[in-house]
Amino acid sequence: LGQIPVTEKSKILGIDPGSRVVGFALIGAIKVKPVSPKDWVVLDVGVIRTSTELSMPARLGQIHGAIFDLLSEMAPQYAAIEKAFHGVNAGTALKLGEARGAIIAAFSRRSVPTLEITPAEVKRIIAGNGAASKEQVYQALQALLGFERGRLPLDASDALAIAYASALARLGPMGQAFTNVAKKNPKRS
């Protein structure tokens, strides 16, 4: 994970990819040199739902179009997405890969640099444990950001974790410390 240049007006759009539901979260820096979660604010968060009645190619088109429109509307400096992981179910992994492709193509068409991060990196940065459960990541996000217990959709909270983890992994002492640990333990990151 390399460093990224950030100003107080920088925005990162985090995306949790899926073939049926795509989570998104836009965060913005409020300091010239943001180094902690408190230096960022949540600007928008939500989900994009595709129709399960549509064919997979039609859903991919829907996802691509929705992300393309979000990028136009939100104008982020960076877009962050989870790297593909090896799932137990080959069909599910293939559909996720197709959805990621549609999303990354939208990033590319809008010339928005793509930050990729593994699920284990997100969990380690946000919850302090690369094997944390989704609930533990959600609770850690609550503690870091101080938002109320009202439930975000799971895909939206995952996108929020992706955006924050991508920012923190590349900025300031926390990001540098994570990068150093990852370099020393390449099989664990």
What are the residue ranges of the model-derived segments?
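Phosphate- and other anionic-substrate recognition elements at nucleic-acid/protein interfaces
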Residues: L1-S189
